[in-house]
From Swiss-Prot:
This is ATP-dependent zinc metalloprotease FtsH 1. The gene is ftsH1. Its EC number is 3.4.24.-. Binds 1 zinc ion per subunit. One of its GO terms (biological process) is protein catabolic process. GO terms for molecular function: ATP binding; ATP hydrolysis activity; ATP-dependent peptidase activity; metalloendopeptidase activity; zinc ion binding. GO terms for cellular component: plasma membrane.
Length: 645
């Protein structure tokens, strides 16, 4: 602290001195008359413009001062010339009313000249040398651009353990092995094994890569440095490489240790792919990183962990064994993983007895860990707005709808005719989805506008699916055309409401023909995806490797698949038009119906039965809540322990 204060005081003194001397020098230069010679002096004396004159003995120098009213004329007040100091000069001045003064030459002139003319230059040189010394001195000093910005995490600061990481069991196992090696290296080295130099975490955004790295830091018990890939590159040339060197120097001093680089694609992109050739700053930084990880001087005991969601743009030299020996794929969680993640986040929230984590997990396919955390938080906000003591299943449903489909737009003005068209459209989707085999069950249908949609038919998968059969793909196309088919069947006209449905159906049909081999053209891939790296970015371009004649055949097959799906939708709606009417009337009356209510209507129940069912369900839920609260002595339900699955 004292050295810092001394440095600041020295800087302050030097700056004040430099400003003062510069102003004094400028002030003197501005008052001195430029280009003033002896002839101009005599003319000024004759004109009565000179106030004082001084002859300096032992020299031929004459100095003086003009009258103030003539300062603007001469752009100054003081003058200095080489003139005649004999009697003639004295008499000349006397004749014009000026009595000259005499003084000996100032012996301190040299020092004054040195102070005014040379001291500013000396100060500038001294400041430059001081700055260069500060740069070489290292961390904490001024202008230390080349020092690493890595942060050292302590054991007790934001400590995360593997117990708080769920849904990525395989990734946890790989990283737990790294932690085990750091704690007991002899267990592996006695069999000839060596510690991996680097671990690359690859996965979509929000899957928990950074959380895994924090868990490693919490479990390992060794120094853990963390830095972002963007922290290396600055506007100054050579800063990135210098920071890499400094980072590994810190790591070697604290070995064994872990270094975590988040978003490494910011510095590790493919060389030669962008503008600037092989000499741009990012490539110099990458070259230094490659050398530090596995060059002539090995970094024993320093384990690198990096995270990225763009492995396709990373330089191959960075991915080879010896640098990143292990690549850990962090996928989006499956059904079981989503249940585990929900359980972790639900521990912090009071839950009602009707909350079913497995049902929520089934209704959130494709959600990442971050999405699920946001879902639980959104449900808590929904419950808080209703002044509830605990979260109910209804709150999670509202939160999921808001996250997946957008907020309700109840203020949107919709005419009765448009509302009726939307109701028939969604009822058409629903009825086709119920009658076709193999599709996911209908979970909810609504005609309340959400996001960009006027209505939504939501399905809920019963199980995780890793592949798609031909029959299910064809049924999905028919399901997508259910809304358009209902419009044509009822109104004898069609609207733009099916635009997104048609786009999705066409994509499925084209992929069936060109990628999946599900047509008469056979199991051939007519379109391959290219991923060239251009300017550090991969573009998923499709290359067409077929003739124009084959393109015509492909279009024909796609049209057949689309027509077949549309015909199926029309036929189902014609055969069950009474059920279509019941679904439509229920949507117009209640705006939203759930999966059980859909089953009732499709199986022949009247619309009036929906109200009876809802009242019975409401009474049942109230009884369950009252019983649970009495059992828990009024405490929030679900707040007494961890969520069980």
């Amino acid at each position: 602290m004292r050295s810092t204060q001394k440095t600041l005081a020295l800087w302050f003194f030097l700056i004040i001195m430099a400003v003062f001397l510069f102003q004094a020098y400028e002030s003197k230069q501005q008052k001195a008359i430029a280009d003033f010679n002896f002839s101009k002096f005599t003319e000024a004396v004759k004109a009565g413009e000179v106030a004082t004159v001084t002859f300096r003995q032992d020299t031929s120098e004459v100095v003086g001062e003009m009258k103030p009213e003539f300062e603007k004329k001469y752009n100054g007040t003081h003058f200095s010339i080489v003139g005649n100091t004999q009697d003639e000069g004295y008499k000349f001045l006397q004749q014009h009313g000026i009595t000259p003064n005499y003084e000996r030459a100032d012996n301190g002139g040299f020092f004054q000249s040195l102070l005014v003319n040379w001291l500013p230059l000396i100060l500038i040189v001294a400041m430059f040398l001081f700055i260069m010394r500060q740069i070489q001195a290292g961390g904490g000093k001024a202008m230390s651009f080349g020092k690493s910005r890595a942060r050292l995490l302590t054991e007790h600061k934001n400590r995360v353990t593997f117990k708080e990481v769920a849904g990525v069991d395989e990734a946890k196992e790989d990283l737990q092995e790294i932690v085990s090696f750091l704690k007991d290296p002899k267990k592996y080295t006695k069999l000839g094994g060596r510690i991996p130099k680097g671990v690359l975490l690859v996965g979509s955004p929000g899957t928990g890569k950074t959380l895994l790295a924090r868990a490693v830091a919490g479990e390992a018990g060794v120094p853990f440095f963390t830095i972002s890939g963007s922290d290396f590159v600055e506007m100054f040339v050579g800063v990135g490489a210098s920071r890499v060197r400094d980072l590994f120097e810190q790591g070697k001093k604290n070995a064994p240790c872990l270094i975590f680089i988040d978003e490494i694609d910011a510095v590790g992109r493919h060389r030669g792919a962008g503008m600037g050739g092989g000499h741009d700053e990012r490539e110099q930084t990458l070259n230094q990183l490659l050398v530090e990880m596995d060059g002539f001087e090995s970094s024993e005991g320093v384990i690198m962990i990096a995270a990225t969601n763009r492995p396709d743009v990373l330089d191959p030299a960075l991915l080879r064994p010896g640098r990143f020996d292990r690549r850990v794929i962090v996928n989006k969680p499956d059904l079981k993983g989503r249940e585990q993640i929900l359980a972790v986040h639900m521990r912090k929230t009071p839950l009602g007895p009707d909350v079913d984590a497995s049902k929520i997990a089934r209704g959130t396919p494709g959600f990442s860990g971050a999405d699920l955390e946001n879902l639980v938080n959104e449900a808590a906000l929904v419950a808080a707005r209703s002044d509830k003591k605990y979260l109910e299943m209804e709150d999670f449903e509202k939160a999921k709808d808001k996250v997946t489909m957008g907020a309700e737009r109840r203020s949107m003005v919709i005419s009765d005719e448009d509302k009726k068209v939307t109701a028939y459209h969604e009822a058409g989707h629903t009825l086709v989805g119920k009658k076709l085999v193999g599709l996911d069950p209908i979970h909810k249908v609504t005609i309340i506008p959400r996001g960009m949609a006027l209505g939504v038919t939501q399905t809920l998968p019963e199980k995780e699916s890793v592949s798609l059969s031909k029959s299910k793909a064809e049924n999905m196309i028919a399901f997508l055309f259910g809304g358009r088919a209902a419009e044509e069947l009822i109104f004898k006209d069609i609207t733009t409401g099916a635009g997104n449905d048609i786009e999705r159906a066409t994509e499925i049909a084209r992929r069936m023909v060109c990628e999946w081999g599900m047509s008469k053209l056979g199991p051939l891939a007519y379109e391959t995806r290219d991923n060239p790296v251009f300017m550090g970015m991969g573009y998923g371009n499709k290359s067409k490797e077929y003739s124009d004649a084959k393109a015509q055949e492909i279009d024909t097959e796609v049209e057949k698949i689309i027509k077949h799906g549309y015909d199926i939708s029309i036929q189902i709606l014609r055969d069950h038009q009474d059920a279509l009417e019941r679904l439509t009337q229920a949507l117009l009356e209640y705006e939203t119906i759930d999966g059980h209510e859909v089953d009732m209507l499709v199986n022949g129940a009247a619309v009036a039965e929906i109200e009876k069912y809802r009242n019975a369900k409401k009474d049942s839920n109230a009884a369950i809540m009252n019983a649970a609260e009495k059992k828990g002595s009024g405490d929030p339900v679900g707040n007494t322990g961890p969520v069980t699955i």
